[in-house]
């Protein structure tokens, strides 16, 4: 009786979407995500930030290398078909 039901939440969400629009909400979500990421980076010590950046660079390099390796395979399959 005293709680908020799913229908009430849906009605509030619908009103918010109608008032602000999806583009405004999307940009607001992106800004909020950036703020949270910045806060997390500010809370970690400087040494950990450097190691996290190195890990991200390694993951990015590995991902791009895997994508480059997969690309010739798909091209050869396309040529065979």
UniProtKB/Swiss-Prot annotation:
Source species: Shewanella frigidimarina (strain NCIMB 400)
What protein name does the entry list?
A: Sec-independent protein translocase protein TatA
A single Pfam family, by name? TatA_B_E
The membrane-topology field of this record reads: Single-pass membrane protein
Gene symbol? tatA
What keywords are assigned to this protein? Cell inner membrane, Cell membrane, Membrane, Protein transport, Translocation, Transmembrane, Transmembrane helix, Transport
Keyword Glycosyltransferase on this protein?
Answer: no
Say yes or no: keyword Transmembrane present: yes
Q: What InterPro entries does this protein map onto? A: TatA/B/E, TatA/E
PANTHER family given for it?
Answer: SEC-INDEPENDENT PROTEIN TRANSLOCASE PROTEIN TATA
| Family note | Belongs to the TatA/E family.
Main location group: membrane
- What's an example of a GO molecular-function annotation for this chain? protein transmembrane transporter activity
Compartments, record wording:
Cell inner membrane
Chain ranges passing through the membrane: 1-21
Compositionally biased spans, kind Basic and acidic residues: 47-59, 70-81
């Amino acid at each position: 009786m005293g709680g908020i039901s799913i229908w009430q939440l849906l009605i509030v969400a619908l009103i918010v979407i109608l008032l602000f629009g999806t583009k405004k909400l999307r940009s607001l979500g992106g800004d909020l995500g950036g703020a949270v990421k910045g806060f997390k980076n500010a809370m970690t010590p400087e040494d950990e930030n450097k190691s996290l950046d190195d890990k991200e660079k390694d993951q990015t390099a590995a991902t791009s290398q895997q994508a480059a390796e997969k690309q010739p395979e798909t091209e050869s399959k396309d040529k065979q078909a």
